[in-house]
Regions:
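C-terminal non-catalytic regions of proteins with extracellular/luminal or membrane-system context
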Residues: 15-17, 34, 50, 81-95, ...
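Residue-level detector of family-conserved "landmark" positions at structurally sensitive sites
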Residues: 8, 40, 76, 97-98, ...
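Second-shell residues forming the walls of enzyme active-site clefts
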Residues: 1-76, 81-83, 89, 94-97, ...
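Short coil/turn segments at secondary-structure boundaries
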Residues: 9, 78, 100-101, 116-123, ...
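Conserved, charged catalytic cores of large soluble enzymes
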Residues: 1, 103, 107-126
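Short linear capping/connector segments at secondary-structure termini
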Residues: 9-11, 46, 84, 119-128, ...
Length: 375
């Protein structure tokens, strides 16, 4: 019963990194609170104390203090092993403390029955279950319920009759992998799925419209803008511990050709759907930005499409596909920034937020816009 494992964060409390906080881990957690489980560091906590936080002079002292504080499992610090051995040989670390950590790991495995049944991955079950129809149906239902229609001046639902033309525009309108969000196989933290999840299992917003509209209703696509360019980290190819540094995402340069193509497509259409937001290089662990503004050419794209909507009277639906709060331009939310205001923003008829809706997210978004699902 209860929690079997705690993972320790990178943060410091009162100047003491959590990984080395003996009072918190041993005196309070294991002592006063009688915690019987194991403690595991986050990715390279011990190593980062040497090469990033610079609170430990070397791996020998870092390993010593990590074990003394009460850590059991040291995640992804290759130098910990030699550092701990050197600490024992130099009299800095009592070997009995290592024995205690090992005993807690073994005790957890015994409680879970892993020595009798290691519960290794079942390849046949993996192929049969992961991405199964039940999984896809569940994701679709969750996506339908998670998408929020923040503003609608009456443009939705849109009636996609055979004589209509729909322009689906934006850098995320047909971006299968970024629709899934962080930690989904090609997030930058791992390289075992460099091409991401299987494309044929993902329904983008563009896919969703093409699947749902009746025969004769034309759906066209323009990228319209780029979000980021990936560049080498100026700090070098590898971290000081030898692990590779991922590329850094910087705001993409404005591309007039992409914008012109999108505007031309929008002018000829009866409905304009703009899908904007962020990508995995801008969110999650090790990735943050100094602004919540849309990056790259996205604001310019939205303003141009809003102008088309004003000139032609055609509805513009803006979809924010993002896993964090973002600052939207006035053409989407109005000059007062109050999206629940009854008056329409200048050029935008409807605005919806889809927080990384997953493999069937594009279908859910298209269903809501076309009136097949209640938001």
């Amino acid at each position: 019963e209860g929690c079997g494992t705690f993972m320790l964060g990178y943060e410091s409390i009162d100047g003491a990194p959590v990984t080395f906080n003996k009072w918190l881990l041993s005196d309070k957690l294991r002592g006063d609170w009688n915690y019987q489980g194991t403690l595991i560091t986050d990715w390279d906590n011990v190593g980062r104390s040497v090469w990033e936080q610079k609170v430990k002079p070397d791996y020998m002292h870092a390993a010593t203090d990590a074990v003394k504080a009460g850590n059991d499992l040291i995640m992804t610090t290759p130098q910990f092993f030699d550092g701990a051995i050197k600490a024992v040989r130099n009299g800095l670390l009592d070997e009995s403390l290592i024995d205690e950590a090992v005993s807690r790991i073994l005790a957890l495995k015994f409680r879970l029955g892993l020595f009798e049944d290691p519960r290794l991955p079942d390849e046949k079950r993996i192929k049969a279950v992961i991405g199964s129809k039940d999984h896809q149906d569940l994701n679709l239902q969750i996506a339908r319920e998670s998408v929020a229609l923040l503003k609608n001046n009456g443009a939705l639902p849109f009636s996609a009759t055979p004589d209509k033309r729909i322009a689906v525009i934006g850098p995320l309108a047909d971006d299968a992998q970024n629709q899934l969000g962080d930690w989904t196989g090609n997030s930058g933290q791992v390289n075992w799925m460099p091409d991401g999840q299987p494309r044929d299992m993902i329904t983008t917003v563009l896919d969703g419209f093409r699947q749902l509209v009746p025969e004769g209703c034309e759906v066209v696509y323009s990228r319209g803008a780029d979000i980021i360019d990936l560049v080498d980290d100026p700090e070098g190819e590898c971290y000081p511990d030898g692990q590779p540094r991922p590329k850094i995402g910087v705001s993409a340069r404005f591309d007039q050709r992409l914008l012109d193509e999108a505007v031309a497509n929008a002018r000829q259409s009866d409905l304009i759907v703009a899908v904007v937001g962020d990508v995995v290089q801008l969110v999650g662990e090790t990735c943050s930005t100094a602004t919540l503004e849309l990056l790259g050419g996205q604001n310019a794209l939205l303003e141009a499409l809003a102008n088309v909507a004003k000139e032609t009277g055609k509805p513009l639906v803006v979809v924010l596909l993002s896993s964090k709060p973002q600052v939207m331009p006035a053409c989407v939310i109005g000059t007062n920034g109050v999206i629940v205001d009854e008056s329409a923003a200048d050029g935008t008829s409807a605005f919806m937020w889809a927080p990384n809706p997953g493999m069937k997210g594009g279908q859910a978004i298209a269903e809501i816009i076309l009136g097949k699902t209640e938001p």
